[in-house]
Amino acid sequence: SWCKQCTSFFVEKMKIKSLDTSKDFTLKDNVFKVAMNTQAVYQSVVAEMNNARQGTSSSKNRSLVSGGGKKPFRQKGTGNARQGTSRSPLNRGGGVIFGPSPKFYFKKVNTKTKQLAFKCILSDKVKNDSFKVVESLPSEPKTKEFISFLKKNNLEGKKITIISSVIDDNLSLASRNVPYVSLVKASSCSVRDLFDNDLILIDVSGLEDLSKRFGGKN
């Protein structure tokens, strides 16, 4: 079936070491050991980007611009090219040629396809050693301390998405001046949040939430 072609399961349990304590954590095979499906990832990312668009950009063409009902000058005898309205796009104050108009950009993606995209990206990150787990994230509201934490774990300069079950205010304050770091909640992260980075850094609570969200409670 389609599901069996896209997903591969292994009997052996996957484990990953914590960066800060070297403790082993078990990863669910049905979340972190899934064969890559680029089409599912592509469709999900495009849908998220499309659905984020307002689609309200608008301009007025010659028929929408107010005024211009009077013929600017007589048809013949002036030597000018004939005109029937002063709101022609050729005139100052006229309409816009081929300007933007409101559009509906919404793109639907099936739930199973989107779930598969999440699992594919997480599995790919684990496979390429771009998925790091820590027991706890920095709790001091100091950027200096946060940078030290990144340096200590050899993460400085990499585009990082930090995932946790709850975004702590102190962590938010410490990281908001670091341009290559973004914070997201495990319960609401998007496909693009996981995809658009060099590395995912996640704490234990975030790992549990992700496993439940995409792999079920068992």
Regions picked out by a protein language model, each given a short descriptive name:
Residues 2, 8-50, 54, 100-218:
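Extended polybasic, low-complexity segments that bind anionic RNA or targeting/receptor surfaces
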Residues 2-3, 91:
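Short linear sequence motifs
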Residues 3-4, 82:
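Intrinsically disordered, low-complexity regions enriched in polar/acidic and amide residues
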Residues 56-62:
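Short coil/turn segments at secondary-structure boundaries
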Residues 62-98:
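Glycine/serine-rich anion-binding loops at beta->alpha junctions
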